[in-house]
Amino acid sequence: MVQSLHEFLEENINYLKENGLYNEIDTIEGANGPEIKINGKSYINLSSNNYLGLATNEDLKSAAKAAIDTHGVGAGAVRTINGTLDLHDELEETLAKFKGTEAAIAYQSGFNCNMAAISAVMNKNDAILSDELNHASIIDGCRLSKAKIIRVNHSDMDDLRAKAKEAVESGQYNKVMYITDGVFSMDGDVAKLPEIVEIAEEFGLLTYVDDAHGSGVMGKGAGTVKHFGLQDKIDFQIGTLSKAIGVVGGYVAGTKELIDWLKAQSRPFLFSTSLAPGDTKAITEAVKKLMDSTELHDKLWDNAQYLKNGLSKLGYDTGESETPITPVIIGDEKTTQEFSKRLKDEGVYVKSIVFPTVPRGTGRVRNMPTAAHTKDMLDEAIAAYEKVGKEMKLI
């Protein structure tokens, strides 16, 4: 007798709940800003990816409303039929200038970018070297390509060199690509791009950087690749338009030749309706803001350093983060989840992150300070960390 859908779901949902792996989803009442409201109660929000506070920016809201008035609420078709609006062309030209590349292509999400770009270029005759802590969308994009996937120890340049040498010298593959996050989302560490480029040039590797958490944050806002001055050395620059940019979507930036190929061959571009007009115009406005001023970028880093210093002085382990991402590493999964709940009771919303998202025994709460937080908010959060940490005997 085959298993019914109900039996499958009941068994596996119960397993998740019994093992502390079931994710309870909270509904936010209103905007996702530095303060949020859930079930009528206000919280200091340290869980969003809204790094620069642009998700609630008045100029972006005005731009979106104006675009809806002139272009409607939807694009009406896929890009290759008649869903490419002048707004999309303007956005992609702006993104290319922002990233220092010849061209760019916009997608409906950052996840779509990795599903699209990897499988459009790599196939069963190729090999992909992938950092072991890369985002789930990279993992899925690699699987979709059917290329040989070779896991590389996290930011281990000796391991990368050895595996690149082995893959290239084996003669089994037409192309070999190395893929890495620019900024790793769980720990906040930065990819060693100068060393990666050196190894890539030595062995002829294609280079692919997913800068979801670096765009708007690193390189005075232009990203991790710009931070290291390597715009002409990285073949694929990937980014989201939903984190620091504050809206929705993703993009690939690179040579005109690459972008032409993606427009012809990447399936999410070919078979999914393009970004909505309001979103598209708001994104363009956000990118132009970052090109015109570093004010929000600088405020983000100032707030991040303030929070890190406060948590470190209390005795918390904030890991090796080199970016505003600020983990507080607790260790035990159940203790981590209890810690997050107790902080919520004190008015601080910061989610627990445990196995399998991070290795077992490295549970943490991940703080995401933004440019929109005030020092008073951060002081209140630090005070809550002190109170709960002492009550739970963690500090």
Swiss-Prot record:
Pyridoxal 5'-phosphate binds at G110, F111, S185, D210, D211, A212, H213, T240, L241, S242, K243. Keywords: Pyridoxal phosphate, Transferase. Its EC number is 2.3.1.-. Pfam families: Aminotran_1_2. GO terms for molecular function: pyridoxal phosphate binding; transferase activity. The keyword Metal-binding does not apply. Its cofactor is pyridoxal 5'-phosphate. The modification N6-(pyridoxal phosphate)lysine is found at K243. Coiled coil: none annotated. GO terms for biological process: biosynthetic process. It comes from the Bacteria. It is an enzyme of class 2 (transferase). Substrate binds at H135, T357. PANTHER family: CLASS II AMINOTRANSFERASE/8-AMINO-7-OXONONANOATE SYNTHASE, LD36009P. Homodimer. Belongs to the class-II pyridoxal-phosphate-dependent aminotransferase family. This is Putative pyridoxal phosphate-dependent acyltransferase. It comes from Staphylococcus aureus (strain N315). The lineage of its organism: Bacteria, Bacillati, Bacillota, Bacilli, Bacillales.
